[in-house]
Amino acid sequence: MSQISAETLLAPRSPDASALTMTMFMQPEHSNSLGNVHGGVILKLCDECGGIIASRHARRPAVTVTVDRVNFLKPVLLGRLVLVHGRISWVGRSSIEVELRVEAEHLLTGERTQTNSAYFVYVALGDDRRPTPVPPLLLATDEDRRRFAEGEARHRQRLAEAGRSA
């Protein structure tokens, strides 16, 4: 790991600082016999986008620990451009929740349709490959504060489902 001071590593960051949109054109190898893109392809794109966002925020490697609330709203068709938009919604001590929104764009018309939404949770790893603290979020807007509060509620729900307390 490069030499970055602990103060710099743990300095608060805004959700916008790590937000990302990834795109990928859907080819025949991504689809099933009906011409719909396999759900696993969409999940992989979401995980890649979310992992990059979490690592950007933590300035550390981050690994997936939970895939939460994946919604398949509409099929993604072969030949569409998939856009995966992600941003951090909540952070804990070493955990980072990323909110993901997937759209499919028809290249000839420019029409975009939301196809998926999901929350993925990552844990930042230190040099010893163990969970390590992450920077807090700078919550500058009412929207940031709302997302954080909703993320905190999802975190508590995940802990309750696992039989643990916050």
What does each of the following model-derived ranges do?
Residues M1-A166:
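Terminal targeting signals and extreme-terminal segments of soluble enzymes
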